[in-house]
Amino acid sequence: MFVDSASFSVSSGKGGPGCASFRREKHVPLGGPDGGDGGNGGDVYFIVDNNTHTLANYKGKRAMKAANGVPGLPRNMTGKKGDNLELIVPPGTAVYDADSNELLLDLISEGQKELFLSGGKGGLGNVHFKTSVNQAPTKAQPGLPGETRNIRLELKLIADVGLVGFPNVGKSTLISSISNAKPQIANYEFTTLTPKLGLVEVDEFSGFIMADIPGIIEGASDGKGLGIQFLKHIERTKVLLYMIDLANYRSLKEQFETLKSEVLKFSPNLAKRDFAIALTRLDAAVDADEKIEEFLNEFKFDKKQDIYEYDRQKPFFVLPISSVAGDGLKELKFGLLEILKGEN
């Protein structure tokens, strides 16, 4: 479980001012007041959408505001209501008061729509102030102000795909290449110190959440390194992507068996999760084709399985990739999406 969050202020719109005007037409030289009311300010709504997966759209925002109401018009015409501000969020989003930490809304269900802040009421036009004593009032009301609140959105996310690999195998490079996550990347172990989530957009209508966790080392299940702290974060992912380094001095077989062993010791259920294998750093590998062929033969793995005849004891695919050169990344995204759709 990961927490995505964003903090900013939201405001409803101010009401439009009423109009002070008088009826002026041919043959009506002394017409009475006809100023219309101002339009109400726009409201603020939260809307839950299953096709939204993260709070990325709200990162970096400082303030969001609904539109103000339009001023009233002559001829008793009411100004237009200000456009509403609709905040689209994924299911599972909680809205907190950023100042008091009070839970304000718990947004769970697809299509759920909640009014959060009401717009200010529009001011009255001068037509309302005509009396027997004052037949030509020039008074009109200003609109009432909108409401403002400092909020914090929190989303507890379960990633669809969890990356499993040794430190420095290229997990951070991969997730930064194919998703909207921008983790720290450097050529040393444990660059990733906290889990990172990224939304991978496969096409206009499809995507999934990928999680990058600190690298697993041999003995991680016994508490060595940083991996044990974060293996729990991928316990609820739907698919595991094992990342094995083609340019490493250790054989592909040794790397894979060690990773599998650590995951198995940590959680037998996690080890049974649907999985695929990415053979990384293709651009830096020597004799890559021979290594890949040997690896496939040793385990009797296919390069890619048929989703309708999927043997879950084996990887759905074994794909060489280079995050730096971009090789295999499109196939990787579509392959992972295919497994996830098969799960659903």
UniProtKB/Swiss-Prot annotation:
GO terms for cellular component: cytoplasm
Membrane spanning stretches: none
The enzyme's E.C. designation: 3.6.5.-
Biased composition (Polar residues): 1-12
Amino-acid positions noted as binding GTP in the UniProt annotation, renumbered to this chain: 165-172, 190-194, 212-215, 280-283, 322-324
Gene3D superfamilies (alphabetical): GTP1/OBG domain, P-loop containing nucleotide triphosphate hydrolases
Obg domain ranges (all copies): 1-158
Span of domain OBG-type G: 159-341
Pfam families: GTP1_OBG, MMR_HSR1
Ligand binding (Mg(2+)): 172, 192
Region annotation (Disordered) ranges: 1-36
UniProt record similarity statement: Belongs to the TRAFAC class OBG-HflX-like GTPase superfamily. OBG GTPase family.
Descriptive protein name: GTPase Obg
Gene: obg
